[in-house]
């Protein structure tokens, strides 16, 4: 039997590819022969001929499919496609997302509905992997993958001699054949080359904007892009865009990792070839030849948190039976609570785990299976190219924290990366690329806006203010700026009210019409004050802007409670004003129709009962019109 299927992944950060490759390798263990393909290379005309097709994709922006998938998605949206186009095709969809976003897995949901509408038959439920889960996306990925395999085995039964019990102990082949020059007799000097997808910006300013003794270190970063011409076209950006920064691992941890695995820094990797090109792609973000040192410093995400598959694969490379048993337990269904306590809560990285299993003997080629590449980190740009055409500004929080159990002190990878430049002035190249976000100013500067950006969430709104300042200074009529309300939040007025002079100057100049700052630790009697309290105090003004003047409402900042609380405050404002309008209408009707009191009272009760549905419909309309926009992380 020809046991084939096609797995299509659509990725921007690399996560979808990683998940799709793991799924492909798992299917091979069950005698299924998947064809793995990047959606960029997929011929859309093949889709109606697929017997079984599996999509793995994330959601980007405000509910859009990833950029590489847009040509295929636009093709699928053609209205003239017959309703039976995929009559012979079964499909499965796994979405990777973050439930802190209102558009959680929208791309997967839309694709699922569209494939059904043109005749496709779903193999199983849509998978919705959530990065906010205690176990991250792994929880749903593992669960959904097993359901998928069970469904596929009803279509492609196992051969009679197949022993399913062997799968548990079976080691997958490594992804790559790797050629290494371990001798380097000629002492070749291999210079690390930044991947071709990135511009080489130069660090120009790295300035702390919180007071020195304050617990939070927030930095104003300026990157010089005046000489960025690597991609044949000059680098360009707009207000609201996102800069992706490719960081490096700390030198101390790099040397520790190399010593831990018995490698040598000057070994040279000359070639990396996929063993099975049907299920493995060549590594991206990697230019060869490369030394072991640069591979570990610039490619492997050794400071990242291991996923479940890492523990499963590592169990094959320990010689100590007790260590092996522990790793097997961590990778089992029964061991997930213990794994969460050991790994996710303590934020262990790959080095931490490897040090705790000293009997490891890892074949070098399996490192690419065990440790993923460093992913570029996104930062909202906090400048406007109209005012700063040769620089990009970032507002970066140096992320340091202690873990809940062992109280280990941690610093995020990109935080360490930017911090390292303080003492390393000779190596100030920062690899970046720019991506458009879903947050844009209205087309007309006269349309009013409401901006809510506590902490480093203010970055995108600083870029908005700079753009408004440019138009005010370069306009024939200085009075054409619409209202702009800015709600900023921080902990202390004297410690972390960054960009204070700039924001207050913008208020004086009329760039913004209202500035409300909530200091969560400066409240009277120890009471905390948050931005949503100021928003609710401005209920009438916000309603006027949203309802009567077609204004825009933006939220930017850390995911978690803040975006949810601010959204709830907006919903409360919408509800109270809709009720107020409804009551006013009923009162007018009562005055004009004194003989119909009973009917009016009944209508009033019905409206009050349906108010939540009315509010939700109103809010959904704001989202559809892209007048309610969130940028959270």
Curated annotation (Swiss-Prot):
Location in the cell: Cytoplasm
Residues that hold FMN according to the record: 11-16, 58-61, 131
Biological process according to GO: iron-sulfur cluster assembly
Compositionally biased region (Low complexity): 581-604
Enzyme Commission number(s): 1.18.1.-
GO CC, alphabetical: cytoplasm; cytosol
Similarity annotation: Belongs to the NADPH-dependent diflavin oxidoreductase NDOR1 family. In the N-terminal section; belongs to the flavodoxin family.
Protein name: NADPH-dependent diflavin oxidoreductase 1
Organism encoding this protein: Dictyostelium discoideum
Lineage: Eukaryota, Amoebozoa, Evosea, Eumycetozoa, Dictyostelia
Gene from which this protein is expressed: redC
């Amino acid at each position: 039997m020809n046991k084939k299927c096609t797995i299509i992944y659509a990725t921007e950060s690399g996560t979808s590819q990683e998940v799709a490759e793991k799924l492909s390798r798992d299917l091979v263990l069950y005698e299924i022969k998947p064809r793995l393909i990047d959606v960029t290379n997929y011929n859309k005309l093949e889709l109606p001929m697929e017997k079984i097709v599996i999509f793995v994709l994330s959601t980007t922006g405000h509910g859009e499919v990833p950029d590489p998938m847009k040509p295929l998605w636009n093709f699928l949206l053609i209205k003239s496609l017959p309703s039976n186009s995929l009559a012979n095709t079964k499909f499965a969809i796994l979405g990777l997302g973050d439930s802190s976003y209102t558009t959680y897995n929208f791309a997967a949901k839309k694709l699922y509905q569209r494939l059904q509408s043109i005749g496709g038959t779903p193999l199983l439920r849509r998978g919705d992997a959530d990065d906010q889960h205690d176990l991250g996306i792994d929880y749903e990925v593992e669960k959904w993958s097993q359901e998928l395999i069970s469904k596929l085995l009803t279509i492609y039964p196992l051969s009679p001699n197949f022993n399913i019990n062997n799968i548990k102990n079976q080691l997958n082949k490594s992804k790559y054949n790797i050629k290494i020059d371990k001798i380097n007799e000629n002492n070749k000097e291999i210079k690390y080359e930044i991947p071709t997808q990135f511009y080489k910006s130069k660090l120009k300013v790295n300035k702390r904007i919180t007071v020195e003794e304050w617990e939070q270190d927030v930095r104003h970063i300026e990157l010089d892009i005046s000489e960025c011409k690597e991609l044949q076209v000059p680098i360009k950006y707009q207000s609201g865009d996102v800069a992706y920064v490719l960081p490096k691992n700390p030198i101390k941890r790099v040397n520790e990792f190399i010593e831990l695995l018995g490698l040598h820094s000057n070994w040279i990797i000359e070639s990396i070839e996929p063993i099975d090109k049907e299920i493995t792609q060549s590594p991206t973000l990697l230019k060869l030849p490369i030394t072991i040192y640069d591979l570990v410093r610039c490619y492997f995400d050794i400071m990242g948190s291991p996923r479940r598959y890492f523990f499963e694969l590592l169990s094959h490379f320990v010689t100590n039976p007790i260590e092996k048993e522990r790793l097997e337990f961590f990778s089992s269904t029964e061991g997930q609570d213990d794994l969460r306590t050991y790994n996710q809560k303590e934020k262990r990285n790959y080095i931490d785990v490897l040090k705790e299993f000293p009997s490891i003997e890892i074949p070098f080629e399996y490192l690419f299976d065990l440790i993923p590449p460093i992913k570029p980190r996104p930062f909202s740009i906090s400048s406007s190219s109209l005012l700063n055409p040769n620089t990009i500004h970032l507002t970066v929080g140096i992320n340091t924290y202690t873990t809940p159990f062992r109280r280990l002190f941690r610093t995020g990878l990109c935080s360490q990366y930017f911090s390292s430049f303080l003492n390393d002035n000779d190596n100030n190249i920062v690899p970046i690329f720019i991506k458009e976000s879903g947050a844009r100013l209205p087309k007309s500067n006269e349309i009013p806006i409401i901006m809510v950006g506590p902490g480093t969430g203010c970055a995108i709104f600083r870029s908005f203010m700079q753009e408004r300042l440019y138009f005010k200074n370069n306009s024939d009529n200085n009075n054409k700026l619409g209202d702009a309300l800015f709600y900023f939040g921080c902990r202390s007025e004297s410690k972390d009210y960054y960009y204070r002079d700039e924001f207050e100057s913008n208020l004086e100049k009329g760039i913004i019409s209202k500035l409300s700052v909530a200091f969560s630790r400066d409240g009277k009697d120890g009471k905390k004050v948050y931005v949503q309290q100021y928003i609710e105090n401005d209920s009438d003004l916000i309603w006027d802007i949203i309802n009567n003047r077609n204004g825009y409402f933006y939220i930017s900042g850390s995911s978690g409670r803040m975006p949810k609380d601010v959204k709830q405050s907006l919903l409360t404002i919408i509800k109270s004003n809709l009720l107020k309008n409804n009551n006013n209408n009923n009162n007018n009707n009562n005055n004009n129709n004194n003989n119909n009191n009973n009917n009016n009272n009944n209508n009033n009760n019905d409206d009050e009962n349906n108010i939540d549905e009315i509010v939700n419909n109103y809010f959904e309309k704001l989202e559809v019109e892209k007048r309610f926009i969130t940028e959270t992380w």
